[in-house]
Amino acid sequence: MKKVVISLFALLAGASLAMAEDAGCEAFKWPVAREQALFTAAPATPAGAELAVGAAADLALVPAEKAGFTLPPERAPAQGTFGAVASVDVPAGGAIQISLSGEAWIDVIQDGKAIKSAGYSGVKTCPGIRKSVRFKLAAGPAIVQFSGAKKAELKVAVLTPE
């Protein structure tokens, strides 16, 4: 009988944990299930690489002072943090959504100008995803700068919004 009670408790605790994780991700303003799926197999990617729309990358960051930012980040990175610069080819329609596994600032630059975000959602209770930011751009090349990260790696997904 004692084993049955312990087994039931373990099942209920596991179900509660799974529900809590789902509830944490539900707090985002838009779904992040695609990012969660992509992050599990994100390939290691060096700073300076091109990020593909519809994919994720496990981006290697460098000390912020060595990142080679095209423009100074809108939010100055704290001492001892990491950053990177990457490029993306924005598809027709121009809307992209950049989601991150951890805390970092995102700046998008197109035609030499910093582009303000069109939407932001961030939660601390979703496993593996910290923030998701939307931008409305012109089709064509853009630069994405990541700064202020506390770790030297960051999973990044670039998607078209659902």
Predicted feature locations:
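N-terminal signal peptide c-region/cleavage motif recognized by signal peptidases
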Residues: 13-20
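Acidic, Ser/Thr/Pro
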Residues: 21-162
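Generic hydrophobic/packing signal
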Residues: 8-12, 56
